[in-house]
């Protein structure tokens, strides 16, 4: 006989679970504050050599977070967020922000490098496990790149794309701009890392992309200026990183991956493949944002960045495919599969970040 007894959830167990989660979040927040304090210490490496205990609590939390994010099947969202925020705070020292020069006092710290390497080693293994690298190595690279670019130029609308086009409110649009400002206000910065060295057609094409991103040297035409104008139209913060706390870890991960592949010249093919996807697929995403702005009857200034990007990135996508990655595939036939790896990883991370942004917008609305 079936029992009619109703089993209610164990309130005490649920309470304990919530308290554990809150303690973990608080632990990550405290560790990030400790890390910021370490960043500001003059001569950090020598100070920690003299007093190792000073960084021990942060280091314990860092180790715990790496295990929680990458060490089991059930990834911990808060651990991911903590790690990507720490990694970004280290990586951002590679750029100059026109702020207090003392902020760069530890830019070459071996301790910071050690923290970065600990995170990157575990994180990159976790990311690579999501790609069938062996399968990529068997493909006709040039054919696969052309096929991918053709498919990603005008992809079918996803559920998230339809939501942005048809349902997102003005409040949601402002939230989109807030998150988007994380990249939009410093656009193209990391591309600079791969432009030095021997002159050739590939290098010159990349320089052309950068020059257009930077408005041909005119601040009024720089892409980030158009993004700032969109923010200003709503009375929003136009300072870089002004909405850093809103940025999902998935977006931070894409930026940190970009720092990694531009910083290491051995990953030049991966970066080139990634940039090709970014330039090819960008216009489709921007058309969604533009459609939303037009539906909401926003001003030209509130959507001008999207219109500019659609025009220019369609051209940049063709340049990247024809003059960069196909050329590199011929120049490095044994390693050309890395172009596909970079392309596919950028797509995977980009899709993951886009989904996270839409979830954040829905929550904000």
Located regions from the model:
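Non-heme di-metal
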Residues: 2-365
């Amino acid at each position: 006989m079936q029992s009619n007894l109703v089993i209610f959830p164990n309130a005490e167990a649920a309470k304990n679970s919530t308290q554990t989660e809150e303690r973990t979040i608080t632990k990550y927040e405290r560790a990030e504050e400790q890390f910021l304090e370490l960043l500001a210490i003059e001569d950090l490496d020598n100070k920690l050599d003299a007093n190792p205990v000073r960084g021990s609590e942060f280091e314990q939390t860092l180790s715990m977070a790496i295990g929680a994010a990458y060490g089991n099947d059930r990834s911990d969202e808060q651990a991911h967020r903590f790690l990507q925020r720490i990694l970004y705070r280290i990586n951002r020292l590679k750029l100059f922000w026109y702020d207090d020069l003392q902020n760069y006092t530890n830019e070459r710290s071996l301790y910071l490098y050690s923290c970065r390497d600990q995170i990157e080693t575990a994180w990159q293994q976790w990311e690579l496990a999501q790609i069938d690298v062996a399968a990529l190595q068997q493909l006709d690279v040039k054919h696969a790149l052309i096929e991918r670019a053709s498919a990603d130029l005008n992809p079918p609308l996803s559920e998230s794309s339809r939501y942005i086009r048809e349902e997102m409110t003005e409040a949601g649009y402002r939230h989109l701009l807030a998150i988007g400002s994380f990249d939009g206000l410093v656009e193209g910065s990391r591309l600079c890392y791969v432009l030095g060295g021997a002159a050739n057609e590939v290098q010159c094409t990349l320089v052309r992309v950068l020059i257009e991103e930077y408005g041909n040297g005119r601040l009024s035409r720089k892409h980030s200026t158009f993004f700032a104008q969109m923010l200003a139209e709503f009375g929003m913060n136009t300072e870089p990183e002004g909405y850093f706390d809103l940025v999902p870890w998935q977006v931070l991960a894409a930026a940190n991956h970009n720092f990694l592949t531009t910083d290491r010249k051995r990953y030049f093919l991966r970066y080139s493949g990634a940039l090709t996807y970014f330039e090819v697929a960008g216009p489709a995403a921007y058309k969604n944002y533009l459609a939303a702005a037009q539906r909401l009857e926003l001003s030209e200034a509130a959507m001008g960045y999207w219109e500019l990007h659609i025009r220019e990135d369609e051209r940049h996508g063709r340049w990247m495919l024809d003059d960069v990655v196909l050329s590199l595939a011929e120049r490095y036939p044994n390693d050309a599969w890395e172009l596909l790896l970079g392309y596919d990883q950028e797509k995977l991370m980009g899709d993951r970040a886009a989904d996270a942004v839409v979830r954040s917008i829905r929550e904000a609305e």
